[in-house]
Amino acid sequence: DTAPTGHTLLLLDATQSYHKEVARSQGEIPAAVEKLLPHLRDPQYTDVVIVTLAEMTPVHEASRLAEDLDRAGILHKWWVINSSLAATNTTNKLLKARAQNEVRWINQVAKISQDNFVVIKWHPEEIKGATLSNLFTE
């Protein structure tokens, strides 16, 4: 989980700039800082999964995050659409209308992610741990 779109990369960049300044003034960069961005860029070390809701603003924000990651050379492949009403097959009129509105954004994520996405249906309770990982096999 990260800061809003773009802020994460700015924080990484600011951290790197800070440590470059420390290195300039003191002569050394901590190993953890030197390894951070290379680790984030290494698909053998890091998997980046973009998580969004099937709504306009979250999809646009996630799309901008994907663009920022591309610019930073950080690979990302999978997207998760979380808490989808469209995946619940609800019969409630209000929820059904909201579910129909999600379809456009699910299709947008399908396009952006080149069909590398999963949809997790809305659950009334918070899902954690092993239960969460089981949702990906449903």
Q: Positions of the model-derived regions?
A:
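Phosphate/Mg2+-binding loops and adjacent switch elements
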Residues: T2-T57, E61-R64
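C-terminal lobe/tail of nucleotide-utilizing enzymes
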Residues: R41-T46, L53-E138
